[in-house]
């Protein structure tokens, strides 16, 4: 079964955060191929929107002023392989940072639901960790 997440744009940092719906923060940060990324500042994230850290492998958006925005998506089952995706999402996030018109948050939600979770849960795609880095 696919994880339930909501996409939220944090205007203070201009990053897209994916949060587990109705979940408490019990997860652990996931280390990707670029090393561990710091979690976003909790002061910019309202408490009632759930965790910003990975919860049993749910998506994470990590940001640091010293690093590019990295959106890491993992399936709940395993995280053995990595791919740098050459898809539309990095371009969309880059446009947001430049103040250009880009995909709406609703469209991004549909992108994750239709593309990523469908690949993992319905098609059984074996790549379990996707990393985009701007």
Curated annotation (Swiss-Prot):
Superkingdom of origin: Viruses
Family: Belongs to the orthohepadnavirus protein X family.
Compositionally skewed regions (Low complexity) per UniProt: 29-47
Description of how the protein assembles with itself and partners: May form homodimer. May interact with host CEBPA, CFLAR, CREB1, DDB1, E4F1, HBXIP, HSPD1/HSP60, NFKBIA, POLR2E and SMAD4. Interacts with host SMC5-SMC6 complex and induces its degradation. Interacts with host TRPC4AP; leading to prevent ubiquitination of TRPC4AP. Interacts with host PLSCR1; this interaction promotes ubiquitination and degradation of HBx and impairs HBx-mediated cell proliferation.
This protein's GO CC annotations: host cell mitochondrion; host cell nucleus
Subcellular location: Host cytoplasm; Host nucleus; Host mitochondrion
Residue ranges of the region described as Disordered: 25-48
Location of region: Mitochondrial targeting sequence: 68-117
Keyword DNA repair: no
Record's comment on post-translational modification: A fraction may be phosphorylated in insect cells and HepG2 cells, a human hepatoblastoma cell line. Phosphorylated in vitro by host protein kinase C or mitogen-activated protein kinase. N-acetylated in insect cells.
UniProt keyword annotations, A-Z: Activation of host NF-kappa-B by virus, Activator, Apoptosis, Host cytoplasm, Host G2/M cell cycle arrest by virus, Host mitochondrion, Host nucleus, Host-virus interaction, Modulation of host cell cycle by virus, Transcription, Transcription regulation
Species per Swiss-Prot/TrEMBL record: Hepatitis B virus genotype C subtype adr (isolate Japan/A4/1994)
GO BP annotations listed: DNA-templated transcription; symbiont-mediated activation of host NF-kappaB cascade; symbiont-mediated arrest of host cell cycle during G2/M transition; viral genome replication
Keyword Transcription applies: yes
Gene: X
Pfam families (UniProt xref): X
Function: Multifunctional protein that plays a role in silencing host antiviral defenses and promoting viral transcription. Does not seem to be essential for HBV infection. May be directly involved in development of cirrhosis and liver cancer (hepatocellular carcinoma). Most of cytosolic activities involve modulation of cytosolic calcium. The effect on apoptosis is controversial depending on the cell types in which the studies have been conducted. May induce apoptosis by localizing in mitochondria and causing loss of mitochondrial membrane potential.
Name of the featured protein: Protein X
